[in-house]
């Protein structure tokens, strides 16, 4: 990994590491940069965390990683950032002459990342023909570099994983690899334990929550606020709670104030468990996602997901009108008006909520750590043959 910070990919890594360790595997986590101390404390005691000397291709990093592979007797390396060629290149040289297999994972929608999306945002804001031409050229260059980097990682891995069956064709189209025999689908697990939680609808509060980073490039939390602005007066006994932080938080708080919203709370970064236990609905209005981990986290506590269908993997998780709501993706952009109409189906009908919540919990069980480990174990066994 490049980093071991507080984020979805890192949390998945720590949960899987514990599961692998609990199943009698020697597990270590290695990252290029210094790991976040809180993440290290949250990591299973049986799992060692190593760091290299910054994200770069250097003989020092190669030597340090090779020492780890040999001293820890590593058989399989899981590259949790299956895009940059630098990590793959360091690993390729470090494992030379060793019997080490490599699994690479891309944790997003192939063909989409923050750098490409930033250019698209700039492009949408300008009418200047010359600037548009420059930005289109820049976007195409980024796409070319990204696709070639992804191809490099694929070619230097024994298995390459994506998070959804719907991403297989997108991977093929984006990389130009028409017959990717090493490609497979591996979904993420629920990363929060529900403990002894039992759904009791009467204990659920009339609350919509957003959980996650607050930024514009990906999460677009302003859409949640826009939607809530159409609902607050009609449902004065409901509230919206934003759990998370990020570069756009100040702007989002100003937006809520400008709209005169009263029943909105900004909680900052918090453990989401207590919010999952009490809330009825979780909104996710991202412009793109890989998996949307918060969806299955919330679903495991009977929180009905209401999510923008901007990424194909959401349809693996949410069956619109059955275990949640999908706001249809539109080329002209997200419609707060249409989202508000769909949300009211749950907000004013307890029976609808109760049914969806039960089905959401059942869906979340497919993503339990135990179930996900079984599929990983099958992959490990295939690589060992």
Task: Describe each PLM feature range.
Residues 2-7, 13, 19-57, 167, ...:
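N-terminal strand-loop element at the rim of the active site
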Residues 10-15, 206, 215-230, 247-253:
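A conserved mid-protein helix/loop that constitutes part of the nucleotide-sugar donor-binding site
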Residues 79-86, 106-109:
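Short His-centered aromatic/hydrophobic patch
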Residues 139-182, 192:
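A short, active-site helix/loop in glycosyltransferases that binds the activated sugar's phosphate group
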Residues 250-269:
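Nucleotide-activated donor-binding/catalytic signature segment of Leloir-type glycosyltransferases, i.e.
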Residues 287:
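Aromatic "clamp/platform" in nucleotide-sugar-dependent glycosyltransferases that forms part
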Residues 304-308, 318:
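Short hydrophobic beta-strand element within catalytic cores of glycosyltransferases
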């Amino acid at each position: 990994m490049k980093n071991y910070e507080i984020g979805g990919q890192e949390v998945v890594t720590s949960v899987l590491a514990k599961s692998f360790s609990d199943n009698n595997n020697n597990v270590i986590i290695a990252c290029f940069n210094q790991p976040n101390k809180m993440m290290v404390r949250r990591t299973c005691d049986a799992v060692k965390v190593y760091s290299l000397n910054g994200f770069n291709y250097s003989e020092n990093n190669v030597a340090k990683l090779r020492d780890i592979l040999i001293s820890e007797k590593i058989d399989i390396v899981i590259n949790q950032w299956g895009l940059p060629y630098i990590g793959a290149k360091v690993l390729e040289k470090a494992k030379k002459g060793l019997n080490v297999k490599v699994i690479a994972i891309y944790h997003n929608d192939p063909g989409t990342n923050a750098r490409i999306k930033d250019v698209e945002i700039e492009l949408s804001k300008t009418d200047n023909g010359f600037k548009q031409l420059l930005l289109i050229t820049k976007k195409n260059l980024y796409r070319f570099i990204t696709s070639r980097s992804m191809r490099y990682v694929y070619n230097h891995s024994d298995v390459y994983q994506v998070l959804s069956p719907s991403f297989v064709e997108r991977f093929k189209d984006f990389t130009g690899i028409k017959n990717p025999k090493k490609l497979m689908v591996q979904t993420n697990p629920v990363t929060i334990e529900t403990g002894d939680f039992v759904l009791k609808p009467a204990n659920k509060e009339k609350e919509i929550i957003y959980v996650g980073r607050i930024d514009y490039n990906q999460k677009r939390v302003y859409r949640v606020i826009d939607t809530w602005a159409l609902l607050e007066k009609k449902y004065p006994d409901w509230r919206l709670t934003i759990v998370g932080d990020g570069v756009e938080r100040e702007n989002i708080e100003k937006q809520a104030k400008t709209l005169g919203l009263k029943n909105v709370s900004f909680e900052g970064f918090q453990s989401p468990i207590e919010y999952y236990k009490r809330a009825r609905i979780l909104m996710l209005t991202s412009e793109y996602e890989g998996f949307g981990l918060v969806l299955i986290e919330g679903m495991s506590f009977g929180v009905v997901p209401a999510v923008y269908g901007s990424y194909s993997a959401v349809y693996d998780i949410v069956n619109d009108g059955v275990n949640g709501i999908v706001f249809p993706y539109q080329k002209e952009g997200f419609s707060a008006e249409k989202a508000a109409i769909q949300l009211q189906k749950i907000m004013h009908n307890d029976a609808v909520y109760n049914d969806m919540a039960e089905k959401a919990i059942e869906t979340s069980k497919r993503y339990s750590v135990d179930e996900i480990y079984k599929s990983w174990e099958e992959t490990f066994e295939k690589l060992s043959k």
